[in-house]
Amino acid sequence: MPAEPRAVALVKLSSLGDVVHALPVAEALAAAFPRARLVWIVERREAALLRDHPALDEVIDVDTRAWRSARTPRQVAEVVRGLVVLRRRLRAARFDVAIDLQGLVKSGAVTRATGAPLRIGFAAGWSRERLNALFTTRRVTPPLEARHVVDQYLALLAPLGVAVSPGRARFRLATRAAAELRIDDFFVGVGLKPRHRLVVLNPGAGRTNKRWPVARFRALAERLCHEAGAQVLVLWGPSERDVARAIVDIPVPRPALAPPTDLDELAAVTRRASVMVAGDTGPLHLAAAVGTPCVGLYGPTSAARNGPYGAGHRVLAAPDGRMASIDVPPVLEAVLEVLGR
């Protein structure tokens, strides 16, 4: 490898929150090696978050979900053809370095497919799947002070001589005018004022044990609307609309129900919030990345490792790991603290 890499592949396939947490790696690489070509390999579903990112030269999307779901001979043949095309594309890029930020077997296989002579990943004890170490040539153990996952990702840059102090990571996200305009139109239509005591609630989560009970979200929304004079907007994702409606269905004044949102529109919503309330989810980390104060609700996952990154946030962690152990009053108090009462 030359003293300064010519082409670097970042492999962080999913999910939304994890991709957000890895963004500072691209920023740090772009600052350290401004002439290097930076390419991010990511799942198709999360790719929109990275399109037009100022630190990246290219985004390559893959569909590992389709790889895993192939059952018929025709589907398998299509997957194989796609993998051959992907491998050729990666080899043609002539990567000097590939960095596996995910630590899985599938991410390791993609990292290996880049053909990069230097393939950096986590040491076996830090990888999510131990066999991931088979695909990397340089394995890193993050320092003790790197408690947050963002800082652990940045530790993977040490073999390249790049260092970012814990807590000093930088986030940037591309903005898209069309998405911003659609959300502006929605706000006007429902009478919401951006950043004016606007509390955005995100009741969903990828795992059921990371979800705060719907009844608690509803009680919080009612107190915010009726006692705190706050505006409340409830987000929802696939299969979550009924949950959001149950939270919105309170006596007037009631929360607004968000429209269906893609990733660009979700980012636009979080930019307009005064505070985001959510569990350990992608929308929470997206809000933190755009600079919106967050109230994070944590049960089975570590708030020290996975909490909203940066200053100005509040975290409530259930001592027994159960989301139902977090009651409404302390969450309300945390929101009011952020709002300035």
Predicted regions, residues:
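Catalytic machinery of carbohydrate-active enzymes
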Residues: 1-341
